[in-house]
C-alpha cells in the first residue's frame, strides 16, 4: 500500500490533479465558515440546537455545518442537485430535452447551461425562504437574562443581502465542483458533499467519548455501534464493487492478411450502477417540503404538516426508501443504455452466446440489469433508513446514527471508492500497481 501511495507522487499529472482537488476542497471549507452579514452568531448557535433532529439538521449535514452557521455556503450544493433532477426528469417526458440528450457533446453543454440557470432560480427561492426563517420569532434564544433574535435588524435590507450572499455562495460552490470534476480527481459535487459530512465526524467522536466518561452511555453500546459500522461498511463495499458478468464473444474477421476478433470478453453489470446518486437525489427531494416551510414560518398548518417529515417519524423514512429505489432505476437507465451497448457489439462483430444480435441482445441485457438492480436498490434503501432503526432501538440521536449507517456512511464509502478507482485508473495506465486489486501490472523501473 505504501508503494502505491508513493507511485501517486511519481506521476506529475496525477499529483497535480490531487493537489488541485485538495486546494479547492479547502476553499469550500473556508467558505463554510464565513457568516452572511446581519447575523448574531451566538444567538444563532443557541437557537439552531432546537432543530438538530429535524430536516434542518439533516440539511446541515449535507451542507457540512454551513447551514447551522448561516454562512455563504449555507445552501451547499443541493440547489444544483435539485435543478439537475428536474432537468433529467423533464428529459424523460419533454421532446426538447430528449433531443438535447441525444445531441452528444453540444446537447450536454446546453443541458449544463440550463442546469446552471435552474440552480440560480432554486437558490433565489431558497435564500428568500431562509431569510424569512431567520427573521421569524422562533429563531431567537435566551442569552443571559435577555431573549435575543438571530437577526438584530430585520427588514428588506437583510433579505436582499441574504439572497445575494447565498446565491453567490451557491454559484461559487457549483463552479468549484465543476472545476474539480474537469481538472481534479473524482466527482466534484460528490466530494464536496463527502468532505462536508466528514467535517462533522470529530465533533461526534468527542461527544461520544464525553458520554462514555460521564456514564451516560455504556462502553458495551459503543462497541456494538462500532462493530455495526464495520459490518455495514463491508456490505456497502460489496454492494459498490459487486457485478454480474455477461460473456461476450467476438467473431473472427479477415481484413487483408490480418485476422481480427475471435477473443472472449464480458460486460460487467454492477449491482449498484447508479452509485451514491440515488441517495443524493432522494435526499434533495425530501428537502423540498422543508424549503417550502421556510416561506411560512408563522403558519401553524404548514409547521404541523412538517412534523410528518421529521427524521424521527417513520413516514419520512418510508418515503425516503421508496425514492431511493425509484432513483436507483432512474439513474441506472441514464447511466447504462442496453440498446447502445447492443448496437456497438453488433457493429464490431460481438455477440452474447445463445442470444441473437440486435434487439434480442438489448432485451437480454436490460432484463439482466433489471434483476441485478432490484436487490441493489433494496439494500441501498435499507442502509439509508438504518439510522431510524438505530434511533428507535438504541435511543441515540440522528447525528450519531447517521455515521453508523445511512446516508452519511453510504456517501463517504461510495465517493471514496469512486475516487480510488479513478486514481487506480491513472496508476494502471502508467503500469503501476493499483489500490483495489492485487496482481496488477508492475511498474517498469
Question: How would you label these PLM feature ranges?
Answer:
Residues 1-101, 105-445:
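N-terminal cationic and glycine-rich segments that engage phosphates or anionic surfaces
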